[in-house]
Amino acid sequence: MIWGLLFLLFLAVIFIGLNAFYKQTDYFKWQHLELESYKQGVPEQLDCGGFGSTYALYAFQAMPQYHSNNRFFNFSLNAESIEQDYLLFNKYKSHFNKGAFVLFTLAPCVCYYTYEESPQYNSYFLLSHKELPNFKLSRFIRFKFPLLYDFKQIFRSLKFLLNGQKQELSLDALFPQSVSEEVAKMNMKGMAEGWMHLFRLPNLREKNQDELNERVLKENADYLKSMIDDCIQHEMIPVIVITPLAKELTNYFGKAFLDNGMYKLIQDAVGTHQVRLLDYLYDADFQDNRSLFADGGFRLNVAGSSLLCKKIMKELLEN
């Protein structure tokens, strides 16, 4: 009996050790690359910070060069919902100085996106169980011990280690510097069709008619409003930023869809407050220049990020 228990204990120790090893491999880190900055710690006394989804994660790559001594932090995550923005903002708002710029970054379809649809790993990694909506112990265990549900990952990580060359963990390394016109059109067509499928939309030109989308739109407006109110209460400066997209993607959008979706969300969230809106959606410098995008029209590369951040800081500091 005691030998059996000791053997089980030995297996448990081996399994925990393998999980710890796996989570330190580049194979695992590449899957959760946006968390690397969080692992280094969120600085105190921030003068500026950005919240948003994938588009913001890439858009703000160059922003630290405008803020010395770690005074900027990009809180954005891949496929992040506005509710996740809200949860992270509440956790880290004490890290901002008075007078700091808090950039809430939006794109046309994020207004219909919910927390439950977003990847849960990031939330479980960054937030405590008390801070998480609908915390589930089974989900926590799955994220804590990924090999428990897919042990083959340890072999994939070893294959990645043996076959791949050591590469610096960076967002820009995930994509080429730019893509051809043909690839850009294909990528953006896939993105537009993916949004239509995810949000049950016949197209991205007409006003949304889906009742669930309308409910989510109102909820997300409430989350954004709460963050704006909190900023003003704590003497921080909320700024809404709409990141640029190339024409390969904006050609899918119609005025009715945007006015009754993203822009309605902004209007409802801002209310009577005077909140600056920096709208680069159709910015001419980006519309016809897919070379500024890593995927042809959605994710900015380093050059695109540098240009956008320069524009943003010019607006913030001159007005």
Predicted regions mapped to residue ranges:
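Active-site segments of SGNH/GDSL-like serine hydrolases
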Residues: 228-255
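Histidine-centered active-site loop/cap adjacent to the catalytic His
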Residues: 293-319
